[in-house]
């Protein structure tokens, strides 16, 4: 039984990488796949805290595993790796003892990994066959649409979940939903509440058949949204709030500020008090 280590970050859904995985699975259905996602910062934009970077990488792992299970019937092991892709890959080699490595990068003109001679270094250090797959997701796109969902108290409301379910069933591309839950403060209790809100959302969303993963984020919802827009290639944004009489986000004009910060369409979903109380 062969074991293949797949190393990728932003290109994890790229067409050429998916084909490389599919080819190996068709040649040998017993092949095991391990996905390693180094937790790398975006090159431009705001400074992003390490915890957010780690969570973003974990979201990529979670969504890759779920998408490949649903679309390709593959059960894949995944992990977040060291920020340095060479170290992350060598750590995964020691942990999983693969027979082959597939590394997916952006084209040479935009790939920081290639500027560091990653492919040659891995081949020399590991002694394993290393296939380099180039995925130009900026021109090719992805086989799914990524929807960024920003919510907190309304994250598991009926209104939001119905909106996402309708979007997922629109008959077009598969939708992957990334929910971001901003903290309500900087204390430990706020972290626990945000994680509880995330857990409740994930339970309900997955029960509804949605392909989704999520993370907690900066207490400022605008910064949380901007950070997520830097980390992920987002096709749509959904912002869920309470009504205008109760929503601090609306008083801060959050929806319009996000619209000005991205070219992606931004939708606003309002949950009623009763929905929120029952969620």
Which functions belong to the PLM regions below?
Residues 1-48, 132-135, 142-192, 264, ...:
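Small/aliphatic-rich secondary-structure junction motif
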Residues 48-54:
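Short glycine-enriched, charge-decorated loop/helix-capping segments at active-site entrances
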Residues 125-128, 261-264:
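Long, contiguous binding/interaction regions
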Residues 37, 105-106, 180, 236, ...:
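Short secondary-structure boundary segments
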């Amino acid at each position: 039984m062969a074991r293949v280590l797949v190393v990728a970050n932003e290109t994890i859904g790229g067409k050429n990488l998916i084909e490389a995985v599919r080819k190996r699975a068709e040649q040998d259905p017993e092949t095991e796949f391990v996905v390693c996602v180094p937790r790398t910062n975006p090159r431009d934009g705001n400074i992003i805290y390490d915890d957010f970077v780690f969570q973003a990488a974990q979201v990529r792992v979670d969504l890759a595993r779920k998408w490949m299970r649903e679309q390709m019937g593959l059960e894949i092991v995944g992990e977040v790796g060291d920020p340095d892709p060479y170290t992350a890959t060598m750590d995964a080699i020691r942990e999983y003892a693969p027979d082959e490595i597939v590394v997916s990068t952006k084209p040479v003109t935009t790939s920081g990994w290639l500027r560091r001679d990653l492919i040659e270094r891995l081949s020399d250090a590991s002694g394993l066959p290393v296939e380099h797959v180039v995925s130009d997701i900026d021109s090719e796109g992805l086989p799914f649409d990524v929807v960024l969902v920003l919510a907190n108290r309304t994250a598991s409301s009926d209104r939001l979940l119905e909106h996402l379910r309708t979007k997922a069933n629109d008959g077009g591309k598969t939708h992957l939903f990334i929910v971001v839950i901003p903290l309500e403060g900087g204390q430990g209790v706020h972290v626990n509440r945000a994680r509880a809100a995330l857990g409740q959302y994930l339970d309900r969303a997955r029960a509804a058949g949605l392909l989704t993963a999520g993370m907690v984020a900066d207490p400022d919802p605008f910064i949380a949204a901007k950070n997520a827009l830097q980390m992920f290639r987002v096709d749509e944004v959904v912002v869920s709030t309470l009504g205008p009489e109760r929503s601090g986000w609306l008083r801060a004009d959050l929806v319009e500020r996000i619209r000005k910060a991205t070219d992606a369409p931004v939708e606003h979903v309002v949950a009623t008090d009763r929905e929120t109380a029952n969620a």
